[in-house]
Structures are given as structure tokens and as C-alpha cells.
């Protein structure tokens, strides 16, 4: 009966895919972490990765707590993301995914806690984009 719950929000499979895309961006951070010559970028890549993982874990637990556990077949790591070696751009990519979920979840008052979680994540990623400007790691500017 899960289908009736999702009438006004994005497809459950799309939510699951979005969650696993976020995890892949966390892995992308590790690629930056290992390949950079900048100590600042090395440390920031791990900070960004930890932020993404913590947020994604909380997002998944909260979403599945409200809508129910996904079936194993609803989950896949076979996702396509825009791989990048620019931490600022990577932060924006994760915010774009979270914002798509926020737009739909904002329609349901009972999901206000998840909307707040997403808003906090967006603020955290904005700070990380700013920190990435130090040592010229990135000159990326967050979208308004």
C-alpha cells in the first residue's frame, strides 16, 4: 500500500536513488582527499565527506522512518553523478539533490523535521564552499 502514501511526493525509488547519489558524492570527496597536494583541501575533503555521510544517514533514517523501509530492490549504488575534483562544485551538487527532496517534502507538514534537516545541511555546505576558497582550493560560488 506504499503507493498511496507517495501520491504528492516524488517517487520512492527516486528518493532512494537520491540518497545513494549523496553517498557517491561522499566517495568523490575521498578521491579528492587522496589526490590533492593541498593540506587544506586534504582536510576539507574529509570534513565535507563526513558532513555528507552524517546528513545522508539522518535523511535516510528519517525518511524511511516516516514512509517505511525500502525494499532491497528499491536500492542501488548504480547511479550517475557529476564527478568533480572541485569541492565547491561537489557541495553544490549535493545541495541540488537535497533541494529536490526538500521541494517535495515541504508539501507535507509532517515532514517539517526533514525539511529543517535539509536546510541545516545547505547551510553547512555553504560554509564548506566558503572554506574551499581558502588556499585557492575552489573559486566556486554557491547558487542563490
Descriptions of predicted regions:
Residues 24-47, 104-111:
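Helix-loop segments that flank and shape redox-cofactor active sites
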Residues 30, 53-54, 110, 130:
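Extracellular secretory-pathway ectodomains and N-terminal mature segments of eukaryotic proteins
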Residues 1-9:
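Compositionally biased low-complexity segments enriched in polar/charged residues
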Residues 18-34, 59-62, 94-102, 124-136:
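Long, well-ordered alpha-helical segments
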Residues 65-69, 131-144:
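Long amphipathic alpha-helical segments
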Residues 40-71:
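Conserved alpha-helical segments that form or flank metal/cofactor-binding pockets of metalloenzymes
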Residues 75-129:
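Acidic/histidine-rich alpha-helical segments that form the ligand environment
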Residues 10-25, 80-83, 87-90:
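Disorder-to-helix initiation segments
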